[in-house]
Structure formats: C-alpha cells, structure tokens
Amino acid sequence: MSLNFTVVIPARLRSTRLPGKPLLPIAGKPMVQHVWEQARRSGASRVVIATDDASILEACQAFGAEVLMTRADHESGTDRLAEVVAHLGLPADAIVVNVQGDEPLIPPVIIDQVAANLAAHPEAGIATLAEPIHEPETVFNPNAVKVVSDKNGLALTFSRAPLPWARDAFAKDRNVLPEGVPYRRHIGMYAYRVGFLQDFVSWGPCWLEQTEALEQLRALWHGVRIHVEDAIEAPAVGVDTPEDLERVRRLLEA
C-alpha cells in the first residue's frame, strides 16, 4: 500500500542571503515553480506552497499551485508549516514533508524516501536526509550544513561549522579530509508527524537554533529524535548564493 503524505513548500520573499529567491527566474519559470513541479512528481497526495507574500501568492496561483498565505512573523519554516497543517485540518498521525523552496532540482524519489523514513521509525519525531561530503571546501562552507549521527542513524547534532573537527589532521592540512571520517551534508528536507509540529511551535526557538540559524536544533534541544538516512539520489545543488543560482540556471537552461 502506498504511503499517504502531504508536501508543504515554505516560500519567503525576504531571504537574507538571496533576496526575492522564490521568484527568481530559471529557464522561464520562477524558482518555486520548479520545486513545486518536482514535488508533484513524488508520491505525495497533496502539494501546498506556504507564503507570507502576496507576490508569491499571485505567482503560484498563476501556475496552478495550491497556495496558502501565512503570518509573516514565523521564526522558521517549520513554524510556518505548523500554521498550514492547522489550516488543512490534518490528523495528529498524518505525515507532512517540508520541501525547501530553494531546491529546484530536488529529486522526487527522495521526497518519497524521507516520508518512508519517518513511517519506518516511530521512535523518531522527525526524519531527514544527508549525503557524503568528499571535498574539504564543502566541510568548511557555512552554507553546507553538516550532520553527525549515532550508530542507529539518529542525529547527534547539526552545524554550519566543520563537524566533526579533525583536530590532528586539520592542524597539519585543511585541504585534505582525514580518512575514515564520514563527513555528511544535511539535505534540508524533513518529514514530520502533525502532532510533533504542534509541540514544536509551543516550545519557541532556543539559543542554539538562533545561533546557527538551524531550526532542527530546536527539536534536538528538546530531546526529539531525528532519524537521518543517506539520500538514494542527492540533489545537484540548492540555491543559497548568486553563484548557486547561476549553476542551476546553466543546468536547467542547457
């Protein structure tokens, strides 16, 4: 039997790193439309875009998406997601996948994977994905979030800093990654149960989440387990910087 889940795509116009990001044109379409189209190719029963901006609302309606306006004062995309699921009236055990609005090349198969990951791990409140890192530049890039998991696949922590810090190896040479250390980049897509989202919002942000600007740290701070799997197909590139945008444009306009 196929898994029933809903995809929500948070889309904010006021991105701090790349203003106007969801509406930036790529191959004749706004970026958020590419994300929506990829999500529609997954096994999701419903795909909803959540925004706090009228221009995004109008653009999404123009290409036929289901889109909801939310409050503008949310601390994170997950807080925005909680408002959406409350509006949709989903039951507490329903699975919702949060697909970031800056992943226009997100493979539909990994949207299905993260939903199945959560369904297979009832001990976890959240499921997410990662991919191996092989380049030192990525380890030291603050836009590439690193994740370290325990032997059971549960996240120990996430950070924009190089994690783990290879003390002896990096003291000698930071241009080579030490052998035997499984560096992993977090892929910013999550599956939640609706009941967890209600708890998440009630907690409010913690100092660690605010320091790193990583909303998943709020869950770890409160003792919630996050199960992490390596993606069976990794996205080519997310869009965090103007350079990322140009790379994606070259790929989709080729």
Curated annotation (Swiss-Prot):
Write out the entry's keywords from A to Z.
Cytoplasm, Lipopolysaccharide biosynthesis, Nucleotidyltransferase, Transferase
> Which GO molecular function, any one, fits this protein according to its record?
3-deoxy-manno-octulosonate cytidylyltransferase activity
Q: Name one GO cellular component term.
A: cytosol
Catalysed reaction(s) here are:
3-deoxy-alpha-D-manno-oct-2-ulosonate + CTP = CMP-3-deoxy-beta-D-manno-octulosonate + diphosphate
EC assignment: 2.7.7.38
A Pfam family cross-referenced in the UniProt record is CTP_transf_3
State what this protein does: Activates KDO (a required 8-carbon sugar) for incorporation into bacterial lipopolysaccharide in Gram-negative bacteria.
Q: What is this protein called?
A: 3-deoxy-manno-octulosonate cytidylyltransferase
Organism whose genome encodes this protein:
Pseudomonas putida (strain GB-1)
